[in-house]
C-alpha cells in the first residue's frame, strides 16, 4: 500500500475521528456521560468550542512549517480538513452564543457585536473563517483563481483576531491566551523568517548569475 492510499483510507479517517473527539466530549458532558458542564453549562460549552476552534486554527497554521522543516509534503493533504474543523468548532461556539446565551435576541446580538469590542473582533474572525470554509472546495479554487489564495491568506488575520478575542474576554488569568499568543507568534514568525531567507537567496543567486555573466 503506497503513501497516498494509506493517507486516503487509513490516516484521513483516523484524523477525522480524532478531530471529532472534542465535539463528542461536549455531547457526552451535556448528557452526563463523560463528565458535566458545571454550574454554567452555556459558558462551559462556549469556552469548550471556542478553545478548540482556536486550537484547530493554530494546528492548521502549523502544517506549512511542519512540511518545510520535515520535508514530508503529504501533511498538506490534511490542511483543508483541519481548517474545516476549525470553522466547525468556531461555528459551534458562535451558535451556542447566538441560540443559548442570547436566545436569538436580535437587538441584544447587534448591540453586543457593535458595542463590545472583544465580540466585534471575534465576529470578524468568524466571518473571515466562514468565507474560507465556503470557498474551500477545488471548484471554488479554480473559479476564484488568484483571488482564492489572497482570500485564504486571511487565516493569518483569523489567528490574530481569535487570540485577541480570547485575551480580551479573559478577565483575570491570561495563562491560556498567552500560550496561544506565543504559539501564534512562533508560527507567524517562522513564515516571516522563511520568506526573508527565500528572498535573500533569490537575490544572492541573481547576483551570482550577473557576476558569472
Question: Which stretches of residues belong to each language-model region?
Answer:
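Membrane-embedded alpha-helical bundles that constitute the cytochrome b-like, heme-associated redox core
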Residues: 1-213
Amino acid at each position: 500500500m503506497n503513501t497516498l492510499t494509506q493517507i486516503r483510507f487509513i490516516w484521513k479517517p483516523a484524523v477525522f475521528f480524532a478531530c471529532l473527539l472534542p465535539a463528542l466530549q461536549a455531547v457526552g458532558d451535556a448528557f452526563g456521560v463523560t463528565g458535566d458542564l458545571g454550574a454554567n453549562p452555556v459558558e462551559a460549552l462556549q469556552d469548550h468550542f471556542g478553545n478548540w476552534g482556536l486550537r484547530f486554527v493554530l494546528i492548521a497554521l502549523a502544517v506549512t512549517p511542519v512540511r518545510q522543516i520535515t520535508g514530508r509534503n503529504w501533511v498538506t493533504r490534511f490542511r483543508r480538513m483541519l481548517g474545516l474543523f476549525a470553522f466547525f468548532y468556531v461555528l459551534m461556539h458562535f451558535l451556542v452564543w447566538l441560540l443559548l446565551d442570547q436566545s436569538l435576541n436580535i437587538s441584544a446580538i447587534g448591540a453586543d457585536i457593535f458595542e463590545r469590542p472583544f465580540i466585534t473582533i471575534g465576529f470578524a474572525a468568524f466571518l473571515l473563517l466562514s468565507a474560507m470554509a465556503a470557498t474551500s472546495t477545488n471548484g471554488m479554487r479554480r473559479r476564484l483563481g488568484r483571488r482564492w489564495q489572497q482570500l485564504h491568506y486571511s487565516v493569518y488575520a483569523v489567528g490574530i483576531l481569535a487570540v485577541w478575542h480570547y485575551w480580551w474576554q479573559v478577565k483575570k488569568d491570561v495563562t491560556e491566551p498567552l500560550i496561544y499568543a506565543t504559539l501564534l507568534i512562533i508560527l507567524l514568525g517562522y513564515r516571516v523568517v522563511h520568506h526573508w531567507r527565500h528572498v535573500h537567496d533569490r537575490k544572492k543567486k541573481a547576483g551570482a548569475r550577473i557576476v558569472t555573466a
